[in-house]
Every structure is written in C-alpha cells, then in structure tokens.
Design a protein with these regions (language model features):
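N-terminal amphipathic/basic-hydrophobic helices that include classical n-h-c signal peptides
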Residues: 1-6
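Conserved alpha-helical substructure of the radical SAM core
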Residues: 10-17, 21-141, 148-149, 308
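Short, charged low-complexity linear segments at domain edges
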Residues: 38-57, 195-207, 249-272
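Extracellular structured ligand-interaction cores
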Residues: 57-59, 162, 219, 283
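Short, flexible loop/turn elements at secondary-structure junctions
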Residues: 68, 116, 145, 169-171, ...
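Soluble or luminal CAZymes and related metallo-dependent hydrolases
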Residues: 88-92, 122, 176, 214, ...
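Conserved AdoMet/S-adenosylmethionine-binding subsite of the radical SAM
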Residues: 120-245
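Accessory C-terminal segments flanking Radical SAM cores
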Residues: 206-311
Length: 311
C-alpha cells in the first residue's frame, strides 16, 4: 500500500504540477488511488477536480427500491427495518437522476441497488435511461444473487457496454448465483462476484456517548468513499440514508443535500456538494454506528432475521 501511495503521489506531482500535495482534497485522492479505487487513466478527471472547478462524484449508490429478497440482520442499508418497502417509479427515478446530473460534471460509478434491484419490474427502463447519460462513466448493479433476471428486454439492457453486475455472494442464501453467472456468460454480460465471508456489525441504532474528537477519529477510520442517493437527497452513507427515511436517525439539513428541493442556484449547490464531500468531518449518524471504532465486531455472514422477530 505505501509503495502504491508513493507512486500515486509521484504521478500526481508530475501530472498536476500546480497543485500542492498538502491539498486536503488531493490527500483523499491519493488514498483513493492507493486503495485501488482509481487507476492512472483517471488522472485527467482529478486534474479537472483540483484545477478547473470540475465536480466529480467517484461513486454514488442509486437506490431504486427498499424491497429486498433477504432480511440480513447486519444489513448496512437497514433493509429489515422497512415494514412497508417501496419500489420507486421509473418516472421518479429519471427525474431524480436528471436533477443530480444538473449539478455534477461526472459520475465515475453509478451503483444501482436496493434492496434487491432485480426485484424492480422496470429495471431495464431505468438502465436504458441511465446509460444514455454522458456524465455517467459506468453503471454497476449490485445483487445478492437471489433473483434471476428472465425478461428479454432486461437481459438486452444488461449487455450494454457501460453496464456490469456485481454479485454479493452470501453463500447458500445466494441461491441463483451460479445461474446468474451462467446467464451472464451466455449473453456476454460483464459480471463479477464479491465474497466477504466475515461481516462486521455496525451495532444498534441507539445513540452512543462520544466526544467531537472521538467522532472525528471514528469518521476518519470509517473512511467511506461512496455516497448514497435516496429520494433526491445525497447522504454520506447508506446507513444514514435509510435511517433518516425510517425516522430512526435524525439528520440535520446540513448533514445531507436535498438536490430535488434546493433553493439555491446551480453554483451554490455545486459548492455545497463539493464542501459536503470533502470537508465533512463527521455526521450525527456516526453517534448511532460503530463502524470505525473498536466496538465494530465480526459477525456471521448474512445471518437472517426470523419472521416476526423484533429488531
């Protein structure tokens, strides 16, 4: 990691001569390179970010449904807490995406998820619309491998160049994983598998007692890269997004960005998004989470909440 980090710094010094390595945004950029999230091919994008007031969102979760086929106890998205899950209409999702793209210049990776995205009956329409957006570099669908797409229109959409699938392999719970891999191979759909045999628990949603300095340290160690976009609002993470919708996490208006109902002009909103993404030091939701702390413990993978069991 350190060797790669130094290489990244050297590459940035050569390619971004007018930016100091101490720049706080650049420090996060170096971490992203070193962590393998970006390659050298993205150097021009980072030049634009740092030198040309160019707003890039590296990764953002695009939530199309809160309905899921599993009830994982330690779900980071809090899906088991939704008693009345929603599947958003194509019209709303198009409007939501258009609004976001008014303010950002580039989305490196749009992560389509839920819930379980293959549950959405009109996923092909959502993908066909998103793939036409030049500001979106790639689209990744995250599935738990329990639902096999059978709609010919959807399969045709999945074949498009920008689109790929990542299967979160939950062992025996991902009952359609092998069939999905075979379908992707047969139809030349890009597909990969992400297997994490040991999960970690973010803990319950009760408030912890932590000082501002402790929260800053927790936030630094959490080091979340991917933001979450739910119902027209940009949140720092999926736990905050779902928790806020459920009313279990009370986020202030400064702790998310409501791009669907903003009252400022485009430049004001762009500046706020940039400030939110790079200058946030912690959010209130951190008080209701153990990630980034010693309290974050390993737990069994994809343990299911039993029917009727209270969370």
């Amino acid at each position: 990691m350190s060797a790669k980090r130094n290489l990244c710094k050297d590459l940035i010094r050569v390619n971004l001569p007018d930016v100091k390595i101490k720049n706080k945004i650049l420090r996060r950029t170096v971490k992203a390179f070193a962590g393998g999230i970006y390659g050298v091919s993205h150097i021009s994008s980072f030049y634009n970010i740092l030198c040309k007031d160019y707003l890039v969102m590296p990764q953002i979760d695009f939530v199309i449904t809160t309905r899921c086929s599993l009830r994982c106890r330690e779900c980071a998205n809090l899906m088991p807490y939704f008693k009345e899950p929603e599947t958003y209409s194509v019209e709303f999702l198009k409007e939501e995406l258009d609004k976001l793209l008014e303010y950002v210049d580039e989305i490196h990776e749009l992560r389509v998820l839920g819930g379980e995205p293959f549950i959405h009956p009109h996923l092909n329409e959502i993908l066909d619309y998103a793939v036409t957006k030049k500001k979106i570099n790639r689209i990744v669908i995250f599935t738990n491998g329990t639902v096999l797409p059978k709609n010919d229109l959807l399969i045709e959409s999945l074949r498009k160049k920008k689109i790929s699938i990542t299967i979160s392999d939950y062992g025996t719970w991902s009952k359609e994983k092998d069939n999905l891999l075979e379908l992707c191979k047969k139809n030349k759909i890009k597909c990969g598998v992400n297997f994490i045999p040991q999960w970690v628990s973010f803990g319950g949603l009760q408030k912890r007692k932590r000082t501002a300095e402790e929260l800053k340290e927790q936030f630094r160690k959490c080091d979340n890269v991917c933001k979450s976009y739910l119902e027209g609002k940009i949140y720092w993470c999926e736990r905050q997004a779902s928790g806020n919708k459920l009313g279990l996490i009370k986020s202030t208006e400064k702790e998310y960005i409501d791009v669907m109902n903003n009252t400022g002009n485009i430049e004001q909103v762009r500046k706020r998004i940039l400030d939110y993404c790079y200058n946030t030091r912690y959010i209130g939701a951190c008080m209701q989470c153990d990630k980034g702390t010693d309290a974050c413990k390993e737990v069994p993978m994809a343990e299911q909440v039993k029917k009727g069991e209270l969370l």
